[in-house]
C-alpha cells in the first residue's frame, strides 16, 4: 500500500502520513536443494536460537513431490533482517552451516544453495496498522483502486487467501 500511494499524485497529507505508518519485514530466503529425502518430517518448523539466523524453515518437497526431482528434497529458510545486514557467506554459515553442524543436514547431500532478498516479507501488526490501513485503503477505493493480496489488504494472507482476495474483486 505505501508503494501505491507513492505512485499517485495529489494524495491528501493524512493518507500519505497513514501510508508511512504501515510497516513490513524484509529479509532473505535461503533455498537448499538436497540429494536425499532424509530431512526433518515437518512442513514448517521454527528456530528460536540467536546463533541460527533463520526464524522459520519450510520444506517445499514435503508439500508436493513435484517440488523436487525424484530422490531429492528441498528446504527454504527465512531470515528477517535488513538488506546487506549479513554477507552471503554469513547467511550460509549461520543457516545451512548451522543445520549441518547440528546433523540436521549432511554437507555431502547439498546439491545447491540459493539466496534471494525479499523487500516485502510479512506485514507487521503494530499499534498503527488498523487505523492507517483503513485510511489508505478507503482512499484508494475512493479513487477507483481496489487492493488485493497480502500487501493490498495489508494483512497476513496465505497464497490461497491472496488469490481469493483477487477473485472477490473480480466478482
Predicted feature residues:
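Mid-domain catalytic core of redox enzymes
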Residues: 1-90, 94-102, 135, 139
Amino acid at each position: 500500500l505505501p508503494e501505491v500511494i507513492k505512485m499517485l499524485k495529489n494524495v491528501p497529507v493524512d493518507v500519505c502520513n497513514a501510508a508511512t505508518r504501515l510497516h513490513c519485514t524484509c529479509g532473505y530466503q535461503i533455498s537448499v536443494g538436497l540429494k536425499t529425502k532424509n530431512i526433518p518430517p515437518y512442513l514448517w518448523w521454527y528456530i528460536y536460537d540467536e546463533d541460527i539466523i533463520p526464524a522459520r524453515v519450510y520444506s517445499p518437497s514435503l508439500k508436493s513431490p513435484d517440488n523436487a526431482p525424484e530422490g531429492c528434497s528441498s528446504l527454504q529458510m527465512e531470515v528477517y533482517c535488513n538488506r546487506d545486514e549479513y554477507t552471503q557467506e554469513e547467511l550460509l554459515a549461520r543457516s545451512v552451516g548451522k543445520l549441518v553442524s547440528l546433523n540436521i543436514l549432511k554437507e555431502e547431500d547439498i546439491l545447491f544453495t540459493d539466496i534471494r532478498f525479499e523487500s516485502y516479507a510479512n506485514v507487521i501488526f503494530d499499534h498503527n496498522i488498523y487505523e492507517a490501513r483503513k485510511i489508505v485503503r478507503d482512499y484508494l477505493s475512493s479513487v477507483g483502486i481496489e487492493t488485493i493480496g497480502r500487501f493490498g489488504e495489508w494483512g497476513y494472507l496465505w497464497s490461497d487467501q491472496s488469490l481469493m482476495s483477487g477473485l472477490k474483486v473480480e466478482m
